[in-house]
Amino acid sequence: DEAEILAEILNKTPQARIIVGATPAVDLEAFSRIKYQFKAFGLADRVEMSSDQKYTDQMIVDPDYWNSIDVFIDVGRRANPTVIADSLWMGVPVLSLKGERPFDRLGASLVYTAARPGWVAETREDLIKLTVDILSDAGALSKTRKTLRNEMRQALLFNPEPHVRSVERAYLRLLGREVPTS
């Protein structure tokens, strides 16, 4: 389950912690349930709630939240596409587990569309290794954080028009019609 995956990551990265509460949708009751799950692993003290919520909209992430985390880990089941897209746009790498069911693959699909296939893990073991590897190289992570937002401006996820134009041209060719040059 998700807590087991995250607990294993915490065990392999002693400096890491989990910060929940990217949106106001995570209230104190939900946070208590999350923290309780990690108590079984002896890791409850490394689970924190983002305390600086300036927004009340359940879907808006406080921009300061993105400065407080190094990576966003999507374990599949409860993927929030808006938060995943926000994370990438704000320069935070999203490491995603490609699940079995279509809904469990939503985060992975967004990460692929953001031109980051190396951030998608096929198995839970792959996700754990990927996360530990990325968190272990502070220099590379810092560089990624500095350049990711600018790179996302060109990614299909945030810039779909060139792809749509390409598909339109392919359809026109299939129909035997003239393809515009612009």
Residue ranges of model-derived segments:
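Conserved catalytic-core segment of nucleotide-activated headgroup transferases in glycan assembly
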Residues: 1-59, 173, 180
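Short, solvent-exposed polar/charged micro-motifs at secondary-structure junctions
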Residues: 29-30, 57-63, 128-134
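Short acidic alpha-helix that forms the nucleotide-activated donor recognition element
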Residues: 55-69, 89
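Catalytic binding pocket for nucleotide-activated donors in carbohydrate/polymer assembly enzymes
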Residues: 71, 75-160
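C-terminal alpha-helical cap of glycosyltransferases
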Residues: 159-182
